[in-house]
UniProtKB/Swiss-Prot annotation:
SMART domains: GIDA_assoc_3. NAD-binding protein involved in the addition of a carboxymethylaminomethyl (cmnm) group at the wobble position (U34) of certain tRNAs, forming tRNA-cmnm(5)s(2)U34. Belongs to the MnmG family. PROSITE patterns: GIDA_1, GIDA_2. The gene is mnmG. It comes from Clostridium perfringens (strain 13 / Type A). FAD binds at G14, A15, G16, H17, A18, G19. SUPFAM superfamilies: FAD/NAD(P)-binding domain. This is tRNA uridine 5-carboxymethylaminomethyl modification enzyme MnmG.
């Protein structure tokens, strides 16, 4: 029986990585927030890989943290290994990755939600979102409780009508043996929301006691632990190792002989899978020239024997999985504790969303995370914090926070989803960011903390720490640009000792740092009055000095980009009325409804010629007295 259960400013549907960030952001901004989850035991659950960060994903975590989110702080408290990836490459692609203790990660995040002022965490299944006159009115739960609210954030992950597939066995269930949600999809369809079917998967978990690590290559963490959060400070902690092994011809033979039993290849799976995280059977069949594939054996926590078999995601039958795993060096006697599986689920077409992550046609209804067609904990968390901030701003009667492609990877992620859409689970990569030298993980706070403070999410403690860090960097850069190093014999002897060439004339310290064989730290011997600063300040100085020319070039590109972003398109424009646009462009523009010329130019099917037509139209529109330039 239906009953009125109370009213909230904001209701969040789901408490995965998107839901946690959304709920915390909304509550911390002063909104009375209800976070609903199918089970309280799955808050911030990591049903697949036991790590946070990685290439491009580490950037997202740093940006979530810079805005005032929780993911970075949470992993800093609960990681069991820390590693900086891509250190042999340029700073734009350096990415932090941390192995998590999955249970401790969940437990701490749940505690944060439970103790957050303005936030109510409840075990409830939402079966419908109720809308009246195009505006959200509330949500109805399976138990008949109706919660009135001003905004709803849907962060339902991979649970909507989800189906587990293992070989020829399939059944209705959520990830990791949990129940799914089979009723909410109908409510979304009734609201006119387009759904599609995606697929993802996870590898088996094996018992640590059954693994022969002597046949594998040890992968220890870094000696120097770099935290994800800008407010975590120095971390000193014992770390565990991961282990590397490889598939071989025997592994591939087992897969090839049983490929007809794979639901990926016999048509049982209809959903589209992730291109950049293929199953082991997909890798073996698609890349038959490769005689081996990497397999990482990763611990899932300090208090469990479960090991994650990274690189071996599969939907093959259980008996084939056993054969396959036992062919891998070190896994000959492996005992499977959890079987690998594929999971199909409903998700939305994200082009139905605005840049604020609010549905275009439903006032007050936001969506974030894997329900939007993305993959990964970090992509989910990034969307979650944006949706949470914007739902709170909506309730407060304020303008939304819109992050652009030049603001951060979060902006790139959202712009790609809402502008281009996705036909497969979307994964963030550094190659997707055209301004990646500006969007480094080390400067996320310089790019986004002020934005987080302006919307009311960043705490005063974090804000004061940021201001001190910014002041330290700016003062030190200014000092280095003024400090002159003379070419006297004593200085030249030290420079030669460092492997560089003598000075012919005096030079500023800032210019000397640009020499590839020197850096800020090694030149301390020529700088006796140098202030005692944190190491990360020195790291930033090295990057700023060495890449100054490239950074300036990208800043100029951003200035050009922003010119197009400022050319705002009328919200109510019918593109059928714009003369000379091609039919495909008219269809795409009417569907996506871009905010500005910049976004329009990134829509697939809109050509440079179409953009020229729109620019002429806007100029005429402006001259007739309607201003479209902010």
């Amino acid at each position: 029986m239906r009953y009125n259960a109370g009213s909230y400013d904001i209701v969040v549907i789901g408490a995965g990585h998107a839901g946690c960030e959304a709920g915390l952001a909304a509550a911390r901004m002063g909104c009375k927030t209800l976070v609903c989850t199918l089970t309280l035991d799955s808050v911030a659950m990591m049903p697949c890989n036991p790590n946070i960060g990685g290439t491009a994903k580490g950037h997202l975590v740093r940006e979530i943290d810079a805005l005032g989110g929780e993911m970075g702080v949470n992993i800093d408290h609960t990681f069991i290994q820390s590693k900086m990836l891509n250190t042999s490459k340029g700073p734009a692609v350096h990415s932090l990755r941390a192995q998590a203790d999955k249970k401790k990660y969940q437990e701490r995040m749940k505690k944060v939600l439970e103790t957050q002022e303005n936030l109510h965490l409840r075990q409830l299944e939402v079966v419908s979102v109720e809308v009246e006159d195009g505006k959200v009115k509330g949500v109805l739960t399976k138990n008949g409780a109706f919660f009135e609210c001003k905004a709803v954030i849907m962060t339902s992950g991979t649970y909507l009508q989800s189906r587990i597939i293992i070989g020829d066995v399939s059944y209705s269930q959520g990830p990791n043996g949990l129940s799914n949600a089979n009723e909410l999809s109908k409510s979304l369809i009734d609201l006119g929301i387009d759904l599609r079917r995606f697929k993802t998967g996870t590898p088996a978990r094996i018992n640590k006691r059954s693994v022969d690590f002597s046949k594998m290559i040890e992968q220890p963490g870094d000696e120097e632990i770099i935290p994800f959060s800008f407010i975590s400070g120095n971390i000193d902690r014992d770390q565990v190792s991961c282990w590397l092994t490889y598939t071989n011809e025997e592994t591939h033979k087992v897969i090839q002989e049983n490929i007809h039993r794979s639901p990926m290849y016999n048509g049982s799976i209809k959903g589209v899978g992730p291109r950049y995280c293929p199953s082991i059977e997909d890798k073996v069949m698609r890349f038959q020239d490769k005689d081996r594939h990497q397999i990482f054996i990763e611990p899932e926590g300090d208090d469990t024997e479960e090991m994650y078999v990274g690189g071996m995601s599969s939907s093959l039958p259980e008996d084939v999985q056993v054969q396959m795993i036992k062919t891998v060096p070190g896994l000959e006697n492996a005992e499977i504790m959890r079987t690998a599986y594929a999971i199909e689920y409903d998700c939305i077409d994200p082009t139905q969303l605005k840049a604020s992550l609010e549905f275009k046609n439903i006032d007050g209804f936001f969506s974030a995370g894997q329900i939007n067609g993305s993959s990964g904990y970090e992509e989910a968390g990034a969307q979650g914090i944006v949706a949470g901030i914007n739902a709170a701003l909506k309730v407060q009667g304020k303008d939304p926070m819109i992050l652009t492609r030049s603001d951060g990877y979060v902006g790139v992620l959202i712009d790609d989803l809402i502008t281009k859409g996705t036909n497969e689970p979307y994964r963030m990569m550094t190659s997707r960011a055209e301004y990646r030298l500006l969007l480094r993980q080390d400067n996320a706070d310089f790019r986004l903390t002020e934005i987080g403070h302006n919307v009311g999410l960043v705490t005063e403690e974090r804000w004061n720490k940021f201001k001190e860090r910014k002041q330290n960097l700016e003062r030190e850069l200014e000092r280095l640009k003024e400090l002159q190093i003379t070419n006297k014999t004593e200085n030249n002897e030290k420079i030669v000792e460092l492997g560089s060439t003598e000075l012919k004339k005096p030079i500023r310290m800032y210019e000397l740092i640009k020499r590839p064989e020197l850096d800020y730290f090694s030149l301390a011997c020529l700088d006796p009055e140098r202030p005692d600063l944190p190491k990360d300040i020195g790291d930033q100085i090295n990057i700023i000095a060495r890449y100054e020319g490239y950074i300036q070039t990208q800043l100029e590109q951003v200035a050009q980009f922003k010119k197009f972003e400022k050319k705002v398109l009328p919200e109510d424009l019918d593109y059928n009325d714009v003369n000379s646009l091609r039919i495909e462009a008219i269809q795409k523009l009417n569907k996506i409804r871009p905010l500005n010329i910049g976004q329009a130019s990134r829509i697939s099917g809109v050509s440079p010629a179409d953009i020229s037509v729109l620019l002429i139209f806007l100029e005429h529109y402006r001259k007739t007295g309607k201003n479209t330039d902010n």
